[in-house]
Amino acid sequence: MFKRVLTIATLAVLPFAPKGVSAQSNCGTKLYCLIPTAFHTTSSTFNFFNDAFGTQISQLPLASPASGFIYSFDKSGVYTASSESFGPLLSERSETIGRHKLYFAVTYQRFAFSEIDGNDLKHIPILFYYPNEQSPTVVTSTENRVDTKIDQVVAFATFGITSRIDLSVAVPFERVSMGVSSNGSEFSTTSTASASFHEFLAGSASGVGDVVLSAKGTLVKHERFGLAIGTEIRLASGDANNFLGSGTVGVKPYLVLSRRGMVAPHLNVGYQWNGNSVLAADENGNQPLPAYFGYAVGADIGLKRITFVADLLGEHYFNAPQISQPESVSASVNNQSMSFSSVVRVPSASYDADNLSVGIKANPVGHLLVSANALVKLNDGGVRARVVPLIGLSYSF
């Protein structure tokens, strides 16, 4: 019977991995290495899973940095709060906060990821073998579970430079917790020898995420309609190897069209560009994180001290990593072909990640706002949580 040490030393790479990549169990102590270490592979061997994880959990949605209170001069020349609602939560409206006005906010979100491309993260079958080697010695069939949770606290500040231009900063603080378990069976390709194993690894990391700087300017300001443009710049301030950040700078120009009133519809469209990141690395080095086209369409309904908000949020990712549903994969065991159930890499393509956001903003006193929101997934693209709760406090000066 072959030894466990020999098995680990000769563990096979995935069907889609490049030839010549050798498996190792010593990847490192960062969360980026947790999954490949549990599976006894290198991070480059298993980067299809880390790519998918990194694309999503390093670019978590943030609440809007726009103030719930909008100030402007009324017809009599008095500078006063002019909005009939407190605005959206996860999207923008065209109005700016007002000249020399200041806004602070803090939000908390919890992400409990449950699926990846429609696959339950509690049950991920993966087959490891050497399809390109002339004499592979080991085939390993595994059933895997990946538990990932992120607690995110974000501090926001917005300042009105002029009556038409706002500058904002968002500083996220995150705690990422991961647990990876793998149950597997190892088979000799030339004999009846076999062995079973179980691995469990857990880890966590805390720290500052990627800081986001943004500017928004109102282009058109009519009595009821407004048009604004803006740009977000995401800094690579978070530790990408611990999934606290994306590992690269990102730029997102966007356009906002909205209507003012008790019922205030709004439309946001934007394009997120990302640079090269370790989270998308392959045998040729760091590669770009997938870009995406994002949109938000919805409305907020303002009452005297309460605003109800609903948005359809969508992101269309380009050239993004995905994994398949489990399919039959054949490998040689005891010199005979045997079929195993396994997910495999889907060649980089496009997919959509759509969510429904429903929330409320309440004004208990003064210029204080209390917010609550639920982000509900509508489809299966990417690494997803079924529901993401949000609570927040904000104050305008």
Which residues does each predicted region cover?
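A subset of solvent-exposed loop/turn segments in beta-rich extracellular surface proteins, enriched
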Residues: S25-S168, P172-G209, A281, Q322-S341
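Residues that define the transmembrane beta-barrel architecture of outer-membrane proteins
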Residues: F86, G98-H100, K149-A155, A202, ...
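Residues on the lipid-exposed face of transmembrane beta-strands in outer-membrane beta-barrel proteins
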Residues: L90-R93, F104-Y108, A155-I161, V169, ...
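Transmembrane beta-strands of outer-membrane beta-barrel pores
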Residues: Y108-S114, V171-S177, D210, L219, ...
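Repeated loop/turn-to-beta-strand initiation elements of outer-membrane beta-barrel proteins
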Residues: F113, R164-V169, H222-L227, G261-L267, ...
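Outer-membrane beta-barrel translocator domains and adjoining extracellular loop/strand segments
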Residues: I116-L121, V180-E186, I229-G230, D239-G247, ...
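Outer membrane beta-barrel transmembrane domains
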Residues: I124-F128, S191-F197, N286-F397
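Hydrophobic alpha-helical segments and helix pairs
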Residues: F197-V249
